[in-house]
Amino acid sequence: MKLDNIKRVGIILRPSTPELKDMFLEAKRIFESRGIEVSIDHISGGMIDVMGQPFDLLCRNSDFLVTIGGDGTLISAVRRSYEYQIPVLGIHAGKLGFLADLDFSELESFVDDLIAGEYRIDERAMLQATITTKHGESSVVAFNDIVLTRPSISKMIRLETYVDGRTFNTYYGDGVVISTPTGSTAYNLSAGGPVLFPLTHVFALTPICPHSLTQRPVVLPGHFEIEIKTPDASALVIVDGQDMVEITDNDTVHIKLADGGAHLIHRKEFNYFEVLKEKLGWGN
């Protein structure tokens, strides 16, 4: 994927952070001084007293999106813009992020690189979950992970798991994390799951505090599908730590890699392993 003849960009700011107004105005100046029209989504605009556009309209009218904030801001923008398959550039307003890896001080020079074609767009896998309950069916997408966990801390949860239609395992514990390669360094890593290179087409199934020490993480190929049932209790389905659905006994969740993905804009010299070393403190 390439950005040809860039004319319009849409900006999303981290919520509840009105102090980002100065960054927005500076970003607007940088883009507009190079002939690129700038718009902002209406929630971000309302936060800083600037006229904005509804998010769907912003996606339709922009060549790419820019998030200013942190990884959470970028994850939200990627999920909300999924149907448009629009590239996203993440700028961190604070500490370096795994995803929002461009420092704001680098923006002006990077915009020149964008115009010159000196950049890269990485396609990252996403998850799609179909949740079937007594009340109907709903579908969600996730960029990092989908977590099934117990609604109460007082007892374990039992999750029956099927892989490609065949019985695989019954997990007893606090739940499971189903993670994309991008999300493998989030909850998955804390739960003892593996680090997956973000451009691979696989996903991980990792138990959370399992009752049996033989329950270990599993990496599955991208064409597989997982089905999870809660046979005798309710559970929470948490999507990227941002949305939550409660399911009850015998409801099902089907999870697979989504047909589309996320398209992240990076500097041409972006190196995932350098970010990994920085964030995890490796090699220091």
How does the language model describe each region?
Residues 71-73, 94-96, 182-184:
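Short glycine-rich anion-binding loops that position phosphate/pyrophosphate groups of nucleotides
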Residues 20, 72-77, 185-189:
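Short glycine/serine/threonine-rich phosphate/pyrophosphate-binding segments
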Residues 37, 85-87:
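Proline-centered loop/turn at the N-terminus of a beta-strand
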Residues 161, 183, 237:
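Short aromatic-centered micro-motifs
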Residues 148, 164-167, 215-284:
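ATP/nucleoside-binding phosphotransfer catalytic cores, i.e., glycine-rich phosphate-binding loops
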Residues 96-174:
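Catalytic core of DAGKc-family lipid kinases
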Residues 1-64, 68, 105-120, 131-140:
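ATP/NTP phosphate-donor binding region
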Residues 169-214:
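Gly/Ser/Thr-rich active-site loops/lids in small-molecule metabolic enzymes
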